[in-house]
């Protein structure tokens, strides 16, 4: 009897651990504020200016064993840009930069995910300021597992770089201020 119980528990544990490695859909946990889309750009070459987008939504599919099944989709409310300075934020929302009246959303949709050393290369199309261009993000799995509320979570950090001019933003900010670095941290809750 004990032998059957141990075998049953072992088989059950193996099935549960195998289930966590299969492709699963995750919703970005923005309700719990466990996700951030941030950026930084040099200010005149003297310092870094940091900003964030406060309103976005999306999800991802994650299969640790087969990254070719992975997908990422994120939609950002461009008017939610926040650099902790009201006048600058107003300027960033203007037609000189994000043109939020005309382009209310920015979107990222992956086209390919592949293993890249200890992390992943997430290749996709970024639509910003009405222009769509390919972008590659370097992503790393931070961790995954059960949460205290009966769910399962996975968290990632990703970094990338874009050129303002590639997205039709041609305001001259000086040569040191043409590239924007993206810093993304997301925690997803697996769909039940």
UniProtKB/Swiss-Prot annotation:
Record localization: Periplasm
Main location, first listed in the record: periplasm
Disulfide bonding pattern of the chain: none
InterPro entries, A to Z: Lipid/polyisoprenoid-bd_YceI, TTHA0802/YceI-like_sf, UPF0312/YceI
Top-rank lineage group of the source organism: Bacteria
Signal peptide residues on this chain, from the entry's feature table: 1-23
GO cellular component: periplasmic space
Pfam families linked to this entry: YceI
Annotated SUPFAM superfamilies: YceI-like
Keywords, alphabetical: Periplasm, Signal
Family, similarity comment: Belongs to the UPF0312 family. Type 1 subfamily.
PANTHER family: PROTEIN YCEI
Protein name according to UniProt: UPF0312 protein Spro_1887
Organism: Serratia proteamaculans (strain 568)
């Amino acid at each position: 009897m004990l032998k059957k119980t141990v075998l049953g528990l072992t088989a059950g544990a193996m099935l549960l651990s195998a289930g966590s490695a299969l492709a699963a859909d995750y919703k970005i946990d923005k309700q719990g504020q466990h996700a951030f889309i941030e950026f930084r750009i040099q200010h005149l070459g003297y310092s870094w200016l940091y900003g964030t987008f406060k309103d976005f939504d999306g999800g991802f599919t994650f299969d640790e064993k087969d990254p070719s099944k992975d997908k990422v989709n994120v939609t950002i409310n461009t008017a939610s840009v926040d650099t902790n300075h009201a006048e600058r934020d107003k300027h960033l929302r203007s037609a000189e930069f994000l043109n939020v009246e005309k382009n209310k959303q920015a979107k990222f949709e992956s086209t390919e995910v592949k293993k890249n050393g200890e992390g992943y290369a997430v290749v996709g199309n970024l639509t910003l300021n009405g222009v769509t261009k390919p972008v590659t993000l370097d992503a790393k799995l931070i961790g995954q597992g059960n949460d205290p509320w009966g769910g399962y979570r996975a968290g990632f950090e990703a970094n990338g770089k874009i050129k303002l001019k590639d997205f039709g933003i041609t305001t001259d900010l000086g040569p040191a201020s043409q590239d924007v670095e993206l810093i993304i941290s997301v925690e997803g809750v697996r769909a039940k």
